Amino acid sequence: MREAQRLIDKGRLICDGEVISEKNALLSGEICLIEYETNPRGLKPIFECDKFAVFDKPSGVLSHPNGRHCEYSLNDEIWSLYGREASVAHRLDCETSGLIVVGKDKNAVVNLKKLFENRQVYKSYVALAHGKISENLRIEANMDLANDYDDVKMRMRICEDGKSAVTEILPLEYFADIDATLVRAVPLTGRQHQIRLHLFYVEHKILGEPLYGLARPQIENILDKEMSEIERILTTGARRLLLHSDEICFKFDGVEYKIKSKFDAKDEFYKLVKHG
């Protein structure tokens, strides 16, 4: 039953030519299951062992396909290389680039996910934030899903009765010509959009931010890819979210792993803001 519900959520069950959306519907007629064919583009892991691999995900690539019309996701590379038992072990937003861990079989996926859920993984991100940040920050602000009916479904909010969320921010370099600070962000908890919302909360929004600090029509235009690249730059400061998963450390099967991204976030982020 759970597998059938999962397939319905993903739009992969069809009855007499119509996509099934009602989970409790009684079905009769010709029922089809849509099977995905992988569409790899040659992205290779930067590290792998027998049980897992680590990819440096480009910005704009989904970790999982989000429906029948998704042309490409990291899943295409994962299944092509390791088969359909392989899966990502944690989240990484579509526009966030950087390190993402992939279990090669069901057992590895389960055990890796437990490490992330139990906060046994050190994660470090690099971001380019608006304004000058001169000293280390420790941001403690509870978070939850935005509950306003008119709000964007995926957006989070700061609220006293939300879940505990703590982020440490370390300034690395200030660029006066673009009034932005390159920072290292270390989330001590694992809330959705945590770094993004916390930096917005302390008035140092990440450049390129498509959700926080924008009006609903602007957000929808960005998410629906109806906003031009020039307008996106003028609206948010960059044509993509300037947040990168840079370093990850954990212990797995008795071995300590410390994996660093090969992406030069400082140079690339500066060029994206300075030259578009």
Predicted regions and their residues:
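RNA pseudouridine synthases
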Residues: 1-276
